[in-house]
UniProtKB/Swiss-Prot annotation:
GO terms for biological process: translation. Transmembrane segments: none annotated. InterPro entries: Ribosomal_uS11, Ribosomal_uS11_bac-type, Ribosomal_uS11_CS, Ribosomal_uS11_sf. It holds the Pfam family Ribosomal_S11. PANTHER family: 40S RIBOSOMAL PROTEIN S14/30S RIBOSOMAL PROTEIN S11. Part of the 30S ribosomal subunit. This is Small ribosomal subunit protein uS11c. NCBIfam families: PRK05309.1 (NF003698), uS11_bact (TIGR03632). Keywords: Plastid, Ribonucleoprotein, Ribosomal protein, RNA-binding, rRNA-binding. One of its GO terms (molecular function) is rRNA binding. The lineage of its organism: Eukaryota, Viridiplantae, Streptophyta, Embryophyta, Marchantiophyta.
């Protein structure tokens, strides 16, 4: 039994992770990168807002690239070699985040677009009038 929460967190963080799943959620306002193991437990995450971008700068492709690099930095220390990528959302940072993941040297088994598409469900919001 670990003596304290710090020991428990240290023990958990040393676990090797050969394979993982990288989820990219790109909205119009932010880009969130979550990395899980194959069972779905979160290992690492990052977002444009967590990287220090605020307001309209969170929705830029550069902010998404920075968020992806921050999330992957932890994984490389844990020995991640292969990953699957799930991209959802229509945001501007989806391609840049994927490019940053490809540059990191992790072998991508597949890249899947899991954006939810309605089969004529709810009525979309009206156009902006500025």
């Amino acid at each position: 039994m670990p003596n304290s929460m710090e020991e428990m967190n240290l023990r958990r963080s040393r676990r090797r992770l050969p394979r993982g799943v990288i989820h990219i959620q790109a909205s119009f306002n932010n880009t969130i990168i979550t990395v899980t193991d194959t069972r779905g437990r979160v290992v690492s995450w990052s977002s444009a807002g967590a990287c220090g971008f605020k307001g309209a700068r969170k929705s830029t492709p550069f902010a998404a690239q920075t968020a992806a690099e921050n999330a992957i930095r932890i994984l490389i220390d844990r020995g991640l070699k292969q990953a699957e990528v799930m991209i959802s959302g229509p945001g501007p940072g989806r391609d840049t985040a994927l490019r940053a993941i490809r540059r990191s040297g992790i072998v991508l088994n597949f890249v899947r677009d899991v954006t939810p598409m309605p089969h004529n469900g709810c009525r979309p919001p009206g156009k902006r009038r500025v």
